[in-house]
């Protein structure tokens, strides 16, 4: 009995930290970091070794209710960790009257911790960004890629960023209307039913070629299979300019990943849509971030009934970047491709869809082949069956300077009958039957020749199947 009493009176050898001690441990580096910033010391922490003195200072610890005692720190600086240069606006009500704010706007990027930033440049962080508190994100139902307009205030004391005080509009919509928008993943996908017409008054044979051989509909998921030097960049620019000219209701996004800087500049000067790029001299993580920015912005627009087109160059390089950044799965395919690396690009490409009752997301991506890389071939095989439109460029035709170097037999669109009127569809099918009897070079040259001799596809299709007694018999394709 005495032994048990003695053991009960003896303190245990193990020590369990109490709440105050844990609080002290968390605040040590934070206090020193704040002191560094306050002293504007460029050489690091001058307060090393003073942590014990700070902890023993009277009145340092907090009361249970969270209010500081005499000598304690204010709410803004207490327990903020690496966010102590942000600001806490959680107590600001949505209907608070703002009298001295600044009008601002930006694209929202939400962090894993729940807070976010309005980016002036969607793909780059800068000191001009605007901090958005977690309470604002929850109150207004904000999502990644939202275009936010509102009132902000300048940073105070040690704060680094401007702070969002009030949200005036979300994607140019009233706040209450925006709260009712559906979630992209809950929208019902259907086959494309409305064609994106690429033919223009200018003599661009390639655009008329695509309209008849592999039409693109709103909500299409298309792949341009491109060997080196086959003209894919020129083709993408022409597609982009045709979309902006013929369909002003469509929001165009050109996404360039791992491309040459001069090609990025040329695309920005040639295309009227939004060009989002990450050149080859950027880190793979930046490539992935740029792709996320583009797809999230597109989803937000589709949710409110908009038609969006993303032209991606290329899904092959996007997959390469994913292979370098993904957590290794322990398995490796031929060419060094991790099977887990393909999931994120597939999720991007699979987002293309036509939405029932309005809105669509069209993605046309280039896939590189015949590069000499086994990984590129594996990536193409992974995406080959996922698209519902394929346009194959032929290296042999490009080497013979035949443009557009399109392989007619290997190109086409699934359910293209939904994209043509009945009368036009019959002519298109008849055209395909004629071209199917010819070789790759002969069929392409014949179609190019007939297109160049007619002012429009409508006039050209009138020639298809013309009777031998007609005046156009010698020129018909019957």
Task: Describe every region a protein language model picked out.
Residues 231:
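Conserved glycine(s) of the Walker
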Residues 144-158:
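Flexible glycine-rich surface loops and low-complexity tracts that mediate binding to linear polymers
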Residues 126-141:
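Beta-strand/loop nucleic-acid-binding surfaces
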Residues 154-224:
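P-loop NTP-binding catalytic core
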Residues 235, 239:
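Hydrophobic positions on the alpha1 helix immediately C-terminal to the Walker A/P-loop
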Residues 145-147, 219, 364:
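Loop/turn positions that initiate beta-strands
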Residues 240-243, 252-478:
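P-loop NTPase catalytic core
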Residues 1-122, 126-127:
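Acidic low-complexity intrinsically disordered regions
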């Amino acid at each position: 009995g005495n032994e048990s009493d003695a053991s009960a009176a003896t303190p245990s050898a193990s020590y369990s930290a109490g709440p105050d001690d844990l609080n002290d441990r968390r605040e040590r580096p934070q206090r020193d970091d704040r002191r560094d910033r306050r002293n504007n010391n460029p050489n690091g922490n001058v307060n090393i070794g003073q942590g014990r003195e700070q902890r023993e200072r009277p009145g340092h610890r907090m009361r249970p209710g969270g209010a500081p005692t005499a000598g304690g720190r204010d709410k803004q600086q207490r327990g903020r960790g690496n966010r102590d240069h942000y600001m806490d606006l959680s107590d600001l009500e949505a209907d608070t009257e703002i009298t001295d704010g600044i009008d601002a706007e930006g694209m929202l990027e939400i962090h894993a911790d729940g807070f976010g930033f309005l980016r002036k440049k969607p793909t780059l962080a800068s000191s001009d960004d605007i901090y958005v508190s977690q309470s604002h994100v929850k109150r207004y139902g904000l999502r990644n890629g939202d275009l936010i307009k509102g009132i902000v205030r300048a940073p105070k004391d040690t704060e680094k960023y401007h702070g969002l005080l009030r949200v005036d509009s979300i994607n140019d919509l009233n706040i209450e209307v925006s709260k009712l928008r559906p979630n992209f993943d809950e929208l019902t996908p259907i086959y494309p039913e409305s064609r994106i017409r690429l033919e223009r008054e200018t003599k661009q044979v390639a655009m008329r070629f695509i309209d008849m051989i592999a039409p693109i509909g709103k909500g299409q998921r298309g792949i341009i299979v491109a060997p080196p030097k086959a003209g894919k960049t020129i083709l993408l620019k022409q597609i982009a300019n045709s979309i902006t000219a013929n369909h002003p209701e469509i929001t165009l996004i050109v996404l360039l990943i791992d491309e040459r800087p001069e090609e990025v500049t040329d695309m920005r000067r040639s295309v009227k849509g939004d060009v989002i790029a990450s050149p080859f001299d950027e880190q793979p993580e930046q490539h992935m971030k740029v792709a996320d920015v583009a797809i999230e912005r597109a989803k937000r627009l589709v949710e409110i009934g908009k038609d969006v087109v993303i032209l991606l160059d290329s899904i092959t390089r996007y997959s390469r970047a994913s292979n370098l950044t993904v957590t290794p799965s322990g398995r490796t395919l031929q060419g060094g491709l991790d099977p887990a690396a393909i999931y994120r690009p597939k999720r991007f490409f699979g987002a293309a869809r036509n939405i029932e009752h309005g809105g669509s997301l069209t993605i046309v991506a280039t896939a590189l082949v015949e590069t000499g890389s086994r990984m590129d071939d594996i990536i193409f095989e992974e995406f080959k069956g996922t698209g519902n439109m394929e346009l194959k460029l032929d290296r042999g035709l490009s080497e013979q300077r035949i443009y557009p170097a399109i392989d007619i037999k290997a190109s086409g669109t699934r359910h293209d009958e939904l994209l043509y009127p009945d009368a036009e569809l019959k002519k298109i099918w008849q055209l395909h039957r004629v071209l199917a009897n010819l070789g790759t070079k002969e069929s392409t040259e014949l179609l190019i020749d007939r297109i160049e001799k007619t002012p429009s596809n409508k006039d050209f299709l009138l020639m298809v199947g013309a009777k031998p007694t007609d005046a156009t018999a010698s020129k018909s394709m019957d």
